[in-house]
């Protein structure tokens, strides 16, 4: 019997958990309330901060609580172009300006948005990474659904009541700069999680990985593996529908999506 492989150890958590102790908090939209459903609420950008382990900067936005005499600070994913002291408007009747939060159904077709809700009230789940954005393609007023194009290129039908931030996530072009040296990768992943450096399976011994061993580094068996394989064998291309390069014209690929 071989050893417990890396994938099995990761499932147990422990040293493989995300490094979250030093992070600034969960970046989400406001809880949806009466003010956002029927009008708008005004907030002000107090600060733009770096969140360790995240490529995009965060914005601290202060709102007056509509129900109590107090102020609430929310952490938003910063849209490119916002600045400290800027007013942010959230709600159905807010204007279509960079950084404002509106329901997708009120936006014209072709609007570029980020931090988009997947389901109404989930406070932003899609297009959140630095430089990412989704595009509003079309609306169907009868079914109250909207179609959006996600950063992956796939198109998704969502409720028109889903909110989104107008604009592109700040920090774009981050991956254009090459890492160049191992020390930078070390510090990058130290802030994120314990996943670096990653030893290839074919470079291991047979006891440590199903692809290990041999007089030269080769897998020696099909890299595809069935879905119900035991955990110690489930490595490679798990339950792959297809393998290899995407061949053919772009139009064919779009039809598949």
From Swiss-Prot:
Keyword Endoplasmic reticulum belongs to the record: no
Disulphide bond pairs: none
The UniProt record lists the keyword Transport: no
Disordered: region residues: 207-230
GO biological process terms, semicolon-separated: cytoplasmic translation
GO molecular function: RNA binding; rRNA binding; structural constituent of ribosome
Compartment annotation: Cytoplasm
Gene Ontology cellular-component terms listed: cytosolic large ribosomal subunit
NCBIfam families for this protein: PRK09612.1
The protein's assembly and partners: Component of the large ribosomal subunit.
Protein name: Large ribosomal subunit protein uL2
Gene: rpl8
């Amino acid at each position: 019997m071989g050893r417990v492989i890396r994938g099995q150890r990761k499932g147990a958590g422990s040293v493989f958990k995300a490094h979250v102790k030093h992070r600034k908090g969960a970046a989400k939209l406001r809880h949806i309330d009466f003010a956002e459903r029927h009008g708008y609420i005004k907030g002000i950008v107090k600060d733009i901060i770096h969140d360790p382990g995240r490529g995009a900067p965060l914005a601290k936005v202060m709102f007056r609580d509509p129900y109590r005499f107090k102020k609430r600070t929310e952490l938003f994913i910063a849209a490119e172009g916002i600045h400290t002291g800027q007013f942010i408007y959230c709600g159905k009747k807010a204007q279509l300006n960079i950084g404002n939060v509106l329901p997708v159904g009120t936006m014209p077709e072709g609007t570029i948005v980020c931090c988009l809700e997947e389901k109404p009230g989930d406070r932003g789940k899609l297009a959140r990474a630095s430089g990412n954005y989704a595009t509003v393609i079309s609306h169907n007023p009868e079914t109250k659904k909207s179609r959006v194009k996600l950063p992956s290129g796939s198109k998704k039908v969502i409720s028109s009541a889903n909110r989104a931030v107008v604009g592109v996530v700040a920090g774009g072009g981050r991956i254009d700069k090459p890492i160049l040296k191992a020390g930078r990768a070390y510090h990058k992943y130290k802030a994120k999680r314990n996943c670096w450096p990653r030893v290839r399976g074919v470079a291991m011994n047979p006891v440590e990985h199903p692809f290990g061993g041999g007089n030269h580094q080769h897998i020696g068996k099909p890299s595809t593996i069935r879905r119900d394989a035991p955990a110690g064998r489930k490595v490679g291309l798990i339950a792959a529908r297809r393998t290899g390069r995407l061949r053919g014209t772009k139009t064919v690929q779009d039809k598949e999506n």
